[in-house]
Design a protein with these regions (language model features):
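Acidic/glycine-enriched connector segments
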Residues: 2-4, 14-160
Length: 160
């Protein structure tokens, strides 16, 4: 049986988040020839592509050989190559759930660093699935898509 690693990237604010579960079910039940690992950025939120993938995997997928490999960004810490903190770190807005962490501010480079780590981690993803939300900036989704494609990982865009 062949292991399939999928790199999942997507909006935190999908208007039709059910498309994520439907896509993963199609891959698991109709395309994959063995166990599936879904690597995602663990972005929280009811309409997040990552959260919807995690919810489906933990409710149905894991009974059918689908596992998740969540890789949350470390929003609290800067990397050694980040600019000095003054002016670099951003203050969280009230109710900010997109940048979970303990501090009142966050490193804006944490998401791109996490995306690069998801692309580079072994076993290497066979392909990526991107769930951008039409009309939204989708910064993280676009960043991860570019990194994956630059690494030779084909990415399929799925929009409702």
């Amino acid at each position: 049986m062949k292991l399939t690693v999928i790199l999942l990237m997507g909006s935190r604010d999908l208007t039709e988040p059910g498309v994520v579960a439907g896509t993963l079910a199609d891959i698991a039940f109709n395309i994959a020839e063995g166990p599936v690992i879904v690597r995602h950025g663990a972005c929280p939120g009811a309409n997040s592509a990552d959260q919807n993938a995690s919810d489906w995997i933990n409710s149905i997928g894991n009974r059918h050989g689908v596992l998740e490999d969540p890789m949350p960004a470390d929003w609290d810490n800067c990397a050694p190559n980040c600019p000095p903190p003054d002016g670099h770190r951003r203050i969280k807005r009230p109710g900010d759930t997109a940048h979970p962490g303990l501090l009142p501010d966050y490193c804006p480079g944490a998401g791109p660093r996490r995306n690069a780590a998801m692309v580079a981690k072994q076993p290497r993803p066979e392909y990526g699935i991107a769930f951008p939300e039409p009309g939204q900036p989708n910064y993280g989704t676009r960043n991860c898509t570019r990194l994956a494609e630059a690494a030779g990982i084909p990415v399929k865009q799925i929009t409702p």
